């Protein structure tokens, strides 16, 4: 359960609020993440199901899909995202608990993969289709040149991912044979679209608009210095 301040859990759930995986908006280092997961009793060989939401962010599965992305990036293959929230679990007549699960510490040995995230050079290379998963309004204000707008809200209904046939229609504007880079400001909400693309078999990577602008500003500053010499 990666929700913050959650009081009801699926019985036996380990509680690690998703904010513990971050330092402000930046993801912790692989070693820091391995220590966090190991202390919680998770090894890379364990089967993991992630669920939860961020109510201050408006709810929805973005934090869960983001933690799923982090785990996959660390080489954890046996991980899934619960379809729905603990409320959906309870509504189905299944039990909940107010107690968090506690497991003995284990060694989480990361096997970091670069196949799940994009670098600025890759975004600029033209190799991938660029998907802006922010709102239509944000996209209209500014975006990465050439990006296609697929708002993250379009792939979910309430707290759940839309069905496969609907997702296929939404992603119909993309070339399935070409890689995809998905971004939002920090990448958190983009992870929902990235997750949906991965489920459908796309070669997708996650990116952040923050990183794009940091690199753009650096290049502009270098160009300005060169022109003044």
Show which residues each predicted segment covers.
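Cytosolic catalytic domains that perform sulfur/thiol-centered chemistry
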Residues: 1-229
């Amino acid at each position: 359960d990666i929700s913050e301040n959650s009081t009801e859990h699926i019985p036996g759930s380990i509680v690690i609020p998703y904010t513990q995986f971050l330092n402000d908006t930046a993801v912790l280092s692989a070693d820091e993440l391995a220590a966090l997961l190991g202390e919680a009793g998770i090894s890379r060989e364990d089967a993991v199901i992630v669920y939860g939401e961020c109510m201050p962010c408006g709810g929805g599965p973005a934090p869960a899909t983001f933690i799923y992305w982090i785990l996959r990036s660390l080489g954890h293959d046996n991980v899934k995202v619960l379809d729905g929230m603990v409320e959906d679990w309870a509504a189905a007549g299944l039990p909940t608990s107010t107690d968090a699960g506690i497991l003995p510490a284990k060694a989480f040995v990361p096997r970091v993969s670069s196949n799940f995230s994009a670098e600025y050079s890759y975004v600029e290379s033209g190799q991938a289709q660029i998907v802006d998963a922010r709102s239509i309004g944000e996209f209209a204000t500014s975006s990465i040149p050439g990006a296609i707008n697929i708002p993250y809200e379009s792939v979910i209904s309430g707290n759940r991912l839309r069905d496969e046939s609907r997702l296929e229609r939404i992603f119909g504007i993309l070339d399935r044979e070409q890689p995809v880079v998905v971004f939002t400001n920090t990448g958190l909400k983009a992870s929902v679209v990235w997750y949906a693309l991965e489920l459908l078999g796309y070669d997708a990577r996650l990116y952040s608009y923050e990183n794009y602008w940091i690199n753009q500003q650096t290049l502009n500053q270098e160009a300005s210095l060169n022109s003044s010499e």
